[in-house]
Regions:
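Central antiparallel beta-sheet cores of small beta-barrel/beta-sandwich binding domains
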Residues: 21-89, 96-98, 152
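N-terminal cap/lid segment of alpha/beta-hydrolase-fold proteins
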Residues: 111-148
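Short beta-strand element of the alpha/beta-hydrolase
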Residues: 150-159
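Short amphipathic alpha-helix adjacent to the substrate-entry channel of hydrolases
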Residues: 167-189
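Alpha/beta-hydrolase active-site loop
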Residues: 173, 205-226
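Primarily recognizes the serine-hydrolase "nucleophile elbow" in alpha/beta-hydrolase
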Residues: 218-274
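Short beta-strand/loop motif that positions the catalytic acidic residue
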Residues: 317, 323-325
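Short alpha-helix in the alpha/beta-hydrolase fold that links the catalytic acid
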Residues: 319, 333-344
């Protein structure tokens, strides 16, 4: 649930005007003005796309327009009025950040993400597309298939538009998980959200979790129609976990892996987020006050989220479930959600419900668990959790 309190980034990537070459990748820097330090992360792809993240502002995927790009230089502007221009030298982009005709030096260094998988891969990958005809959406994704794979998972991202790797701040958790699973004989299909990345069509501004669940259902149907796998499961992170139970309640999947998926009504989660993020401001905040907020009332996604109670779908889910949370998760708090899930999930000897000390919402080892740590942590996803996912799925085949 990477929508931080009251912030929704529903902006599409903007194509770059040239080849990224040596500058492709994620670059981080800190803008220092008087006593203020504002980190930025520039994500530049080899295919010619760019997004900008502002971790301390809890905003990501700001689209960047590239006015100039060469193998060692760039100039990126935004519709919200700031421009960055720099030149690559000795592995660092030296440049200036300009806004309102005021320029400040800011250097960008490459972001180190050691878990991101690199080719060649010992398994087959296919670029595929499937369609949610009712929504007019064509979803583009990557199918990773190791030799002899009998089991496949559809991977569903959290809230906000994201690519198939669930990429943020240079981290690519879904790519990391998919690679590890493929190396252990488990296939995956991960896809760009509707109207994002290589996916096209489908309403975005009016879409709710239920609409994104329809996209996921189309992916499950595509996998079943392929006839290549004996078991079709779903892995969902955050909002994707809620979607997993929506499909589980309909009997569409053979098993569920829920990573920090919500198990209580959205208004309770949002209230707890507020209390954790700004305890002094949330002292007198109530669920009733949140429901009266016009920003929530006028936003279809938030309105649905606030009123949706996943326990109805959880209670109707009969398939095996692995549900996990980091105990330092500040966005979908572990105790609140896992205890609720234990109460309502129908008994099944193959369930695994587990919390992990010291892990945040992204399943990184952390200090505070707050979102402003996500970008400064090198680890993308806990290997312990990945190994537990692999071992649990393997038990389902015995």
């Amino acid at each position: 649930m990477k929508r931080i309190v009251y912030i929704s980034v529903l902006l599409a990537l903007v194509a770059l005007n040239g080849a990224a070459q040596n500058i492709s990748g994620s670059w981080s820097g800190v803008l220092e003005v008087e006593d203020t330090r504002l980190p930025f992360v520039y994500n530049i792809t080899a295919e010619g796309r760019c997004t900008i993240d502002s971790p301390s502002e809890k905003v990501r995927n700001i689209p960047g327009d590239v006015d100039y790009l060469s193998p060692d230089s760039l100039c990126i502007s935004t519709s919200i009025g700031f421009v960055y221009a720099g030149r690559l030298q000795d592995g660092v982009i030296h440049g200036t950040f300009t806004q309102n005709k005021v320029s400040v030096p800011m250097d960008l260094s490459p972001v180190h993400r050691p878990q991101t998988p690199q080719p060649p891969f010992p398994y087959h990958t296919e670029l595929v597309k499937f369609t949610n005809a009712n929504a007019g959406a064509t979803l583009a994704g990557t199918l990773s298939v190791p030799e002899g794979a009998k089991c496949v998972l559809l991977m569903v991202t959290g809230s906000g538009l994201e690519n198939r790797d669930e990429e943020l701040f240079g981290h690519k958790p879904f790519a990391v998980i998919a690679d590890c699973l493929a190396r252990q004989g488990i296939a995956t299909l991960r896809y760009d959200d509707r109207a994002y990345g290589e996916s096209v069509g489908g309403d975005v501004m009016g879409a709710t979790t239920s609409d994104f669940a329809d996209d996921a259902a189309a992916g499950i149907e595509w996998l079943r129609r392929s006839g290549r796998f004996q078991q079709v499961g779903i892995l969902g992170h955050s909002e994707g976990g809620a979607i997993a139970f929506m499909l589980g309640a309909q009997g569409l999947v053979d098993f569920i892996v829920s990573l920090a998926g919500p198990a209580v009504q959205g208004d309770s989660i949002l209230l707890e987020q507020c209390r954790i993020a700004t305890p002094e401001l949330a002292e007198n905040l109530t669920i009733e006050v949140l429901h009266r907020d016009p920003r929530i009332q006028q936003n279809p996604w938030y309105s649905f989220f606030m009123n949706y109670n996943p326990q109805t779908d959880i209670a109707a889910t009969a398939c095996p479930v692995m549900a996990v949370n980091g105990e330092s998760d500040c966005q979908v708090p572990a105790e609140m959600n896992l205890s609720a899930l234990r109460r309502v999930l129908p008994a099944n000897g193959r369930h695994l419900i587990k919390s992990y000390p010291g892990l945040n919402h992204l399943f990184q080892h952390c200090e505070t668990g707050l979102p402003d740590e996500y970008d400064v942590i090198e680890e993308t996803f806990s290997e312990e959790v990945i190994n537990d996912i692999i071992n649990w799925i393997k038990t389902l085949n015995h």
